[in-house]
UniProtKB/Swiss-Prot annotation:
It is found in: Cytoplasm. Disulfide bonds: none annotated. PANTHER family: 3-HYDROXYACYL-[ACYL-CARRIER-PROTEIN] DEHYDRATASE. Transmembrane segments: none annotated. Keywords: Cytoplasm, Lipid A biosynthesis, Lipid biosynthesis, Lipid metabolism, Lyase. The keyword Cytoplasm applies. This is 3-hydroxyacyl-[acyl-carrier-protein] dehydratase FabZ. InterPro entries: FabA_FabZ, FabZ, HotDog_dom_sf. It catalyses: a (3R)-hydroxyacyl-[ACP] = a (2E)-enoyl-[ACP] + H2O. The keyword Ion transport does not apply. The active site is at 50. NCBIfam families: fabZ, PRK00006.1. GO terms for molecular function: (3R)-hydroxyacyl-[acyl-carrier-protein] dehydratase activity.
Length: 147
């Protein structure tokens, strides 16, 4: 059973298809941690060009999926309700496993530190029991621009 479904996720973050990379939130401990599921299917638009005959999810999109999961974690706090979380930095990103159609990505994000409207999270994208990607992300929370 999920904590948040896709429609609830879209109420929190501005991302939409084809750049929304999460299907559901499985676990959420506000201000502490989140676990999100992304089912990777052959229908993803990026597989048309990356790579024909050998589909591989681009590493930068795995990072984006982790950043979106981090956004949910951050924006579910009362302090940042109605705001937007922006990616400020990517540190020590490592890609350890190729992600392919049919894989289920489990995105694990843990709050490391937060000060004012900035903070750092530690992230892992898992396929089964193997880490596909690990990284630390820095975020900045700002007003939602309605322009």
């Amino acid at each position: 059973m999920s904590v948040l479904e896709a429609s609830e996720i879209m109420q929190l973050i501005p991302n939409r298809y084809p750049i929304l990379f999460m299907d559901r939130v499985d676990e959420l401990n506000p201000g502490e941690s989140i676990v999100v599921t992304k089912n990777v299917t052959i229908n993803e638009s990026f597989f048309q060009g990356h790579f024909p005959g050998n589909p591989v999810m681009p590493g930068v999109l795995i990072i984006e999926a982790l950043a979106q999961a981090a956004s949910i974690l951050i924006l579910k706090s009362e302090k940042f309700a109605g705001k937007t979380a922006y990616l400020g930095a990517i540190k020590d990103a490592k890609f350890r496993k190729i992600v392919r159609p049919g894989d289920v990505l489990k995105l694990h994000v843990q709050m490391v530190k937060q000060r004012s409207n900035m903070g750092t999270v530690s992230c892992q994208a898992m396929v089964g029991d193997k880490a596909a990607c690990t990284t630390d992300l820095t975020f900045i929370v700002g007003a939602t621009d309605s322009k």
